[in-house]
A protein has these predicted regions:
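Terminal targeting signals and extreme-terminal segments of soluble enzymes
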Residues: 1-129
Length: 129
């Protein structure tokens, strides 16, 4: 991961609030982790869907930015998430990758796993700036 990408990802106050950690961001792929904590729970004691979406969106953004020099060069236009199973505790790993990198738009996909279990799957379109 480039130093610039690492600085961008780790300087987000929202990412720090959630506890996101960038493990990799290079070549159109990113891997982020999130450890479940009480601040991320919904009324049912499970991981809030908004926190899971934020993990996915951030991973996709890092994958997109990694195609260049790591600086923010795109924004999310739309994103569809399939929430597959609830999360009560533990660590999540999100892997995001660029499926199509055009001049004006990019299509990305992501999967979130807890161990071997698939937690969520997503697809999005980004606009290139």
């Amino acid at each position: 991961m480039s130093e610039k990408a690492e600085a961008i990802g780790s300087s987000s106050a929202f990412g720090r609030l959630l506890g996101l950690e960038i493990l990799k961001a290079e070549g159109g792929e990113a891997i982020l982790s999130l450890k479940m904590h009480d601040g991320l729970r919904n009324l049912h004691g499970k991981l809030h869907g908004g926190a899971l979406f934020s993990l996915i969106d951030t991973a996709m953004g890092q994958a997109s930015h990694s195609l260049g020099d790591g600086s923010p060069n795109s924004v999310t236009l739309e994103c569809k998430v399939n929430y597959i199973r609830p999360v009560t505790d533990g660590e999540l790993i999100c892997r995001a990758w660029v499926v199509h990198g055009g001049r004006r738009t990019q299509v990305l996909e992501a999967e979130v796993h807890q161990g071997e279990k698939l937690v969520a799957k997503a697809q999005s379109t980004f606009a290139c700036l």
